[in-house]
């Protein structure tokens, strides 16, 4: 028995090529009901850039357990949550913790894009970006826009 090699020009390869990147509006279809305040497309891009800079400086907290631990320790930063995480019980307590401690938080549409921005191949449902002087200007710009978003109902 021999293995059959996949045709690189076959229909499956073409389907993968056309569907590799999903647009912002396509990602909005999968949002949770609690994903408020939601970042605009422009703010989402700025947050991804800020996250990439923070990863280089190792000023990032990734994952529910780690982020929750450092919120309880009193660390400050911008909380970025993925709006397409299911089940929502995994991280629905984090916005309440942020509001109690006056930490800014925002939802973005995709956990896979959030994980990729953090330099991981795995999807990530929550990231905390801490301030650092190397990317302070980008951080302050994101912080200002996140704080200007309307509060959730």
UniProtKB/Swiss-Prot annotation:
Pfam families: Ribosomal_L7Ae
Cross-link (Glycyl lysine isopeptide (Lys-Gly) (interchain with G-Cter in SUMO)), chain numbering: 5
Compartments in which it is found: Nucleus, Nucleolus; Nucleus, Cajal body
Single annotated GO MF: telomerase RNA binding
GO biological process assignments: rRNA pseudouridine synthesis; snRNA pseudouridine synthesis; telomere maintenance via telomerase
Cross-link entry Glycyl lysine isopeptide (Lys-Gly) (interchain with G-Cter in SUMO2), positions: 3, 5
SUPFAM superfamilies associated with the record: L30e-like
Presence of the UniProt keyword Thylakoid in the record: no
Residues annotated as signal peptide: none
InterPro entries, per database record: eL8/uL1-like, H/ACA_rnp_Nhp2-like, Ribosomal_eL30-like_sf, Ribosomal_eL8/eL30/eS12/Gad45, Ribosomal_eL8/Nhp2
Entry keywords, A to Z: Isopeptide bond, Nucleus, Ribonucleoprotein, Ribosome biogenesis, RNA-binding, rRNA processing, Ubl conjugation
Gene Ontology, cellular component aspect: box H/ACA snoRNP complex; box H/ACA telomerase RNP complex; Cajal body; telomerase holoenzyme complex
Cross-link (Glycyl lysine isopeptide (Lys-Gly) (interchain with G-Cter in SUMO1)): 5
SUBUNIT field: Part of the H/ACA small nucleolar ribonucleoprotein (H/ACA snoRNP) complex, which contains NHP2/NOLA2, GAR1/NOLA1, NOP10/NOLA3, and DKC1/NOLA4, which is presumed to be the catalytic subunit. The complex contains a stable core formed by binding of one or two NOP10-DKC1 heterodimers to NHP2; GAR1 subsequently binds to this core via DKC1. The complex binds a box H/ACA small nucleolar RNA (snoRNA), which may target the specific site of modification within the RNA substrate. During assembly, the complex contains NAF1 instead of GAR1/NOLA1.
Job of this protein: Required for ribosome biogenesis and telomere maintenance. Part of the H/ACA small nucleolar ribonucleoprotein (H/ACA snoRNP) complex, which catalyzes pseudouridylation of rRNA. This involves the isomerization of uridine such that the ribose is subsequently attached to C5, instead of the normal N1. Each rRNA can contain up to 100 pseudouridine ('psi') residues, which may serve to stabilize the conformation of rRNAs. May also be required for correct processing or intranuclear trafficking of TERC, the RNA component of the telomerase reverse transcriptase (TERT) holoenzyme.
Xref: PANTHER family: RIBOSOMAL PROTEIN L7AE FAMILY MEMBER
Family, as annotated: Belongs to the eukaryotic ribosomal protein eL8 family.
Protein name: H/ACA ribonucleoprotein complex subunit 2
Gene for this chain: NHP2
């Amino acid at each position: 028995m021999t293995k059959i090699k996949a045709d690189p020009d076959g229909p499956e390869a073409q389907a993968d090529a056309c569907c590799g990147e999903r647009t912002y509006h396509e990602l909005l279809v999968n949002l949770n009901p609690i994903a408020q305040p939601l970042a605009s497309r422009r703010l989402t891009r700025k947050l991804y850039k800020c996250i990439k800079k923070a990863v280089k400086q190792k000023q990032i907290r990734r994952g529910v357990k780690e982020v929750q631990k450092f919120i309880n320790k009193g660390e400050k930063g911008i909380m970025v949550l993925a709006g397409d995480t299911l089940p929502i019980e995994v991280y629905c307590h984090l916005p309440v913790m942020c509001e109690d401690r006056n930490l800014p938080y925002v939802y973005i549409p995709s956990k896979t894009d959030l994980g990729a921005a953090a330099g991981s191949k795995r999807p990530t449902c929550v990231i905390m970006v801490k301030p650092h002087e190397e990317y302070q200007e980008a951080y302050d710009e994101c912080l200002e826009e996140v704080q200007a978003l309307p509060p959730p109902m």
